[in-house]
Amino acid sequence: MFRMPIVTMERVDSFSAAHRLHSEKLSDAENKETFGKCNNSNGHGHNYVWKVKLRGEVDPTSGMVYDLAKLKKEMSLVLDTVDHRNLDKDVEFFKTTVSTSENVAIYMFEKLKSVMSNPSVLYKVTIEETPKNIFTYKGC
């Protein structure tokens, strides 16, 4: 039995957002010790890079794993929730979850999964907070 080839594809986009690393479960002193300058009461921002990787069989009719134009639109729906926002104040998820880049990766994965026409091909998302700080989430 012939099996269709498995291919990964990746789309990259970016967004700018502000946040403050602060946990309500920690005292002010513990927050300062844990998060350092990222606990600044006025917050700070990043120009994030968001990479989305899909993995699946190549459709014999379209020759694609997933329609890139469709993925671009779906990613745009997610980007609209975070781009030029204060994550802690403007995104419901982060009102109760510390806005670490680990949690940003989880949020972006789950949010994208919820709007994709075929979420089964979503393999992983990567958030680059800086060129040296990179976080990847593959889902549960």
Swiss-Prot record:
Pathway assigned to this chain's UniProt record: Cofactor biosynthesis; tetrahydrobiopterin biosynthesis; tetrahydrobiopterin from 7,8-dihydroneopterin triphosphate: step 1/3
Assembly and interaction partners: Homohexamer formed of two homotrimers in a head to head fashion.
Active site (catalytic residues): 38, 84, 129
Superkingdom, natural source: Eukaryota
UniProt xrefs under InterPro entries: 6-PTP_synth/QueD (IPR007115), 6-PTP_synth/QueD_sf (IPR038418), PTPS_Cys_AS (IPR022470)
Keyword match Lyase: yes
Cofactor note: Binds 1 zinc ion per subunit.
Parts forming coiled coils: none
Primary role: Involved in the biosynthesis of tetrahydrobiopterin, an essential cofactor of aromatic amino acid hydroxylases. Catalyzes the transformation of 7,8-dihydroneopterin triphosphate into 6-pyruvoyl tetrahydropterin.
Miscellaneous comment text of the record: The active site is at the interface between 2 subunits. The proton acceptor Cys is on one subunit, and the charge relay system is on the other subunit.
GO function term, MF aspect, one: 6-pyruvoyltetrahydropterin synthase activity
NCBIfam families: 6PTHBS
Pfam family, one: PTPS
Alphabetical GO biological process terms: tetrahydrobiopterin biosynthetic process
Cystines in this chain: none
Protein family according to the UniProt entry: Belongs to the PTPS family.
Cofactor(s) named in the record: Zn(2+)
GO CC annotations, alphabetized: mitochondrion
Enzyme Commission identifier(s): 4.2.3.12
Annotated protein name in UniProt: Putative 6-pyruvoyl tetrahydrobiopterin synthase
